[in-house]
C-alpha cells in the first residue's frame, strides 16, 4: 500500500522537499497559502494540489509542514480547519519550520491529545540542500515515530538525528545558528585585524 504524505507549505525549501517525496513514488498531496504555487507544483510533479489543509491531511500517514514562523504554525495546526483537527488518528506530524521550542512543545501536546505523534524537525542546508536532497535534520519527538518517519525524511536529507523529546530539534537548531553566527563574527574580526596589520 502506498504511503500518503501531505505537505503543507511550498516555499523555497518545501517546494523541492515535497518534490523529492513525489518523485520517490509516495502519494503526495500539497497545500500552500497561495494556491497558485500548489497548482504549479502539481503540474511539475506526480501529486495533487488541495484547496484546504483539511483535504490535504485527510487519510495521510505523514503530514509535513514547512512554513514561516510560530504564528504560521498556529494557523496551519490549530482550529477546526487545521492539521490537528483533521489528520487521522495515528498520523505522524513532522514540522520542518525553524520556530521556537515552546511552539513545538505546545503542538506536541495538542497532537498527543488526539493520538497523533509530533516531531519538530528544523532543517539546515539551505535551498541548495533542499534541491539536492542533502539536508541535515535535527529532530525532537518520540523515538518510535522518528524511526517510522526516518525513511520518509531520508528522501531529502543527508543526515537525520533524534536529539530528544519535543522541542529538542528546535533547541539544537538554535545551537547551530549561534555557532554559525560566532564563526562569522570571528572571521569578520580576523579579516579586519589582517587589514589593519
Where are these regions (language model features)?
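Anionic-ligand binding region
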Residues: 150, 172-178, 182-197
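Rossmann-like NAD(P)(H) cofactor-binding subdomain of soluble oxidoreductases
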Residues: 53-58, 62-63, 70-135
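Rossmann-fold dinucleotide-binding core
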Residues: 5, 98-178
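Aromatic/hydrophobic pocket-lining residues that form π-stacking "cages" and hydrophobic walls in ligand
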Residues: 38, 107, 190
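NAD(P)+-binding Rossmann beta1-loop-alpha1 motif at the extreme N-terminus of oxidoreductases
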Residues: 1-65, 91, 96-97, 127
